[in-house]
């Protein structure tokens, strides 16, 4: 039995015996966070937050710094891995009703928003062509805010256009936000262990629990090993798979790329933004696409917690997953038919899931004849 209180805490942590592989993503996210902070620190040591030197400093890191290429690729691909894990983690929470642990769910969605902000600021730092124009387009959405929009945008930019002050403050924010993420993650884990994890059956697992270590810790190690293996294979053989070709050119404010788009993990929100032909409407839809996740614990009306035994909810859940993938794909395409109508239809379907959520619960209660 370990004597150190932290080891004892994890060793004796009671966990349901029947949690599946879908519960492994929390530990994978923790590993991704540690990797990002570590590689980010080594990159920050060599990076220069200046519009004339930022792009050159990235080239310097990749070419001249020992193992700089590894740090740079691990940081970029690690961000994609982070988002893959967090989207699966949220999907598992939706499917198995983990959102009924309200405080944990709320802290988790706050974590997602902080992570998205951190990733956005990081995407601007290389000062490539796509970095510059994606930052211009996204920050310009603030001008849609009535009365305060222009003042807010000028304040964020530090001037009347994206320039050196913008890059400096984005670097400062990109450096400080991971510490916010670490704090929120600690809070998330503390809140989770107040009530304990849910399980695939949605039953009260108190009568059948086992210690986290060695049982679940060894189970977690399998997927962790596979994730790190996948990360290193991608880094070694396909290092530029997630990169935009335009970002290999230095930012030029005088030349607009043919098709401006952010990183793939923001494309679903960007696709929803683009599907509405109005600036304020699009900006509101973009914000709502994330914020609507906060409403889920309050719209759960089913008597059963998970979707394991709820066929209608399962159908809508997998429709949501396919919708998410389709919006992401459509957002990579130019704004022209048929991609406009595909984006609009999938955006409507995306919001339909959340709006129909309470109705589905009531319908399923009636189907099961539960009082």
From Swiss-Prot:
The molecular function terms of the Gene Ontology recorded here are: metal ion binding; ubiquinol-cytochrome-c reductase activity
Question: Where do transmembrane segments lie in this chain?
Answer: 25-45, 69-90, 105-125, 170-190, 218-238, 280-300, 312-332, 339-358
Q: Which key words tag this protein in UniProt?
A: Electron transport, Heme, Iron, Membrane, Metal-binding, Mitochondrion, Mitochondrion inner membrane, Respiratory chain, Transmembrane, Transmembrane helix, Transport, Ubiquinone
Annotated binding of heme b b562, by residue:
75, 174
Example of a GO biological process term: mitochondrial electron transport, ubiquinol to cytochrome c
User: So which cofactors does this thing need?
Assistant: heme b
Q: What does this protein do?
A: Component of the ubiquinol-cytochrome c reductase complex (complex III or cytochrome b-c1 complex) that is part of the mitochondrial respiratory chain. The b-c1 complex mediates electron transfer from ubiquinol to cytochrome c. Contributes to the generation of a proton gradient across the mitochondrial membrane that is then used for ATP synthesis.
* Annotated protein name in UniProt: Cytochrome b
Source lineage: Eukaryota, Metazoa, Chordata, Craniata, Vertebrata
């Amino acid at each position: 039995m370990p004597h150190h209180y932290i080891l004892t805490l994890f060793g004796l942590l009671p966990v349901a015996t029947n949690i599946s592989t879908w519960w492994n993503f929390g530990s994978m996210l923790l590993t991704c966070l540690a990797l990002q902070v570590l590689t980010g620190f080594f990159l920050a040591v060599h990076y220069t937050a200046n519009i004339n030197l930022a792009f050159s400093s990235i080239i310097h890191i990749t070419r001249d710094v020992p193992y700089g290429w590894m740090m740079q690729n691990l940081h970029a691909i690690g961000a994609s891995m982070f988002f893959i894990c967090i989207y699966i983690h949220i999907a598992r929470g939706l499917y198995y009703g983990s959102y009924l642990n309200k405080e944990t769910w709320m802290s988790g969605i706050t974590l997602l928003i902080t992570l998205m902000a951190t990733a956005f600021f990081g995407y601007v730092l290389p000062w490539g062509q796509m970095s510059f124009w994606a930052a211009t387009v996204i920050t310009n959405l603030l001008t849609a805010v009535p009365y305060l929009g222009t003042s807010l945008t000028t304040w964020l930019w530090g001037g009347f256009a994206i320039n050196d002050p913008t890059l400096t403050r984005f670097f400062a924010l990109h450096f400080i936000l991971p510490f916010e993420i670490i704090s929120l993650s600690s809070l998330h884990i503390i809140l989770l262990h107040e009530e304990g994890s849910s399980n695939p059956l949605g039953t009260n697992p108190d009568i059948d629990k086992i210690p986290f270590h060695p049982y679940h810790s060894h189970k977690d190690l399998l997927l962790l090993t596979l994730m790190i293996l996948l990360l290193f294979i991608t880094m070694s053989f396909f290092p530029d798979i997630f990169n935009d070709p335009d970002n290999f050119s230095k930012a030029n404010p005088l030349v607009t790329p043919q098709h401006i788009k952010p990183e793939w993990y923001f494309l679903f929100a960007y696709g929803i933004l683009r599907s509405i032909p109005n600036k304020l409407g699009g900006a509101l839809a973009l914000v709502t696409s994330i914020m609507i996740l906060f409403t889920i614990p309050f719209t759960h009306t089913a008597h059963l917690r998970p979707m394991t035994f709820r066929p209608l909810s399962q159908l809508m859940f997998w429709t949501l997953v396919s919708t998410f993938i389709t919006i992401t794909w459509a957002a990579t395409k130019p704004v022209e038919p048929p991609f406009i109508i595909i984006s609009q239809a999938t955006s409507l379907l995306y919001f339909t899931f959340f709006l129909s959520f309470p109705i589905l619960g009531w319908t399923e209660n009636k189907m099961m004849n539960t009082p």
